[in-house]
Design a protein with these regions (language model features):
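Conserved short "hinge" loops at termini or chain/domain junctions
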Residues: 1-53, 101-121
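Mature extracytoplasmic domains of secretory-pathway proteins
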Residues: 50-59, 63, 67-68
Length: 121
């Protein structure tokens, strides 16, 4: 239902992710698309609704990407073997969470139950 190329393009525009993580990014985007599609009632989608759904999938992928990157950066091990956990990534995660929340709220009318199930995920 959702167009992979449009979701992927939106992901790159939102995340500033470099193209060197293509396989990982494509997997994140596909997983986000699957999650959004499974939460939607396809019979409720009309006209331009699909673009809002694709944007929500991109925002979901951005949130997942930001969480993974924060985890990697916080747990990076230096050459000497000591962990470098000096970075504060909570602001990035909070911003990505808010972006996802706003995008999902735009399409909650297309979900059975008004989006409650997705909010708990």
């Amino acid at each position: 239902m959702l167009d992979f190329d449009r979701v992927l393009l939106s992901f790159y525009q939102l995340s500033n992710c470099k193209n060197d993580k293509t396989d990982e990014v494509e997997t994140l985007v596909k997983e986000a698309m699957k999650a959004v599609e499974s939460a939607l009632d396809g019979n409720r989608i009309v006209g331009e609704d699909i673009y809002a759904c694709e944007y929500a999938a991109a925002c979901t992928a951005v949130y997942d990407y930001v969480c993974r990157e924060a985890f990697r950066e916080q747990n990076a091990v230096t050459v000497s073997g000591s962990a470098d956990i000096n970075g504060n990534f909570s602001h990035r995660i909070d911003a990505a969470r808010e972006l996802k929340k706003q995008a999902m709220s735009r399409i909650e009318g297309l979900m059975p139950g008004g989006g409650f199930m997705f909010e708990t995920m």
